[in-house]
Amino acid sequence: MFGRLGAPEIILILVVIILLFGAKKLPDMARSLGKSARILKSEAKAMKSEGQESTPAGPPNTDEQPPAQRTIQAAPGDVTSSRPVSEPTDTTKR
């Protein structure tokens, strides 16, 4: 579908985008999209590393300790601050 797009079609699409959003908003939108992509990439990497670190389920441990808190840090240049997040527990009420 996208393999048939030539230079005139791509230029037309870019002109329409500039007309819709305005030249002033495009850098902010690109910056926001870049931040979102970085966050998504770091979360996917964290999930992948958590999956590799996990061990097969064994007998339940009787000396349960509360799960360690993990801090999610903001992307560089982001105005939000870091906040602690508690990990979900694997226990369910039965």
Curated annotation (Swiss-Prot):
Superkingdom of this protein's organism: Bacteria
Localization per record: Cell membrane
Biased composition (Polar residues): 62-72
Annotated transmembrane regions: 1-21
Molecular function as annotated in GO: protein transmembrane transporter activity
Pfam families membership: TatA_B_E
Plastid listed as a keyword: no
Region (Disordered): 44-94
A GO BP entry: protein transport by the Tat complex
Membrane topology: Single-pass membrane protein
GO cellular component, one term: TAT protein transport complex
UniProt KW keywords: Cell membrane, Membrane, Protein transport, Translocation, Transmembrane, Transmembrane helix, Transport
Quaternary data: The Tat system comprises two distinct complexes: a TatABC complex, containing multiple copies of TatA, TatB and TatC subunits, and a separate TatA complex, containing only TatA subunits. Substrates initially bind to the TatABC complex, which probably triggers association of the separate TatA complex to form the active translocon.
Family recorded in the similarity comment: Belongs to the TatA/E family.
Role, per record: Part of the twin-arginine translocation (Tat) system that transports large folded proteins containing a characteristic twin-arginine motif in their signal peptide across membranes. TatA could form the protein-conducting channel of the Tat system.
The protein's name in its UniProt record: Sec-independent protein translocase protein TatA
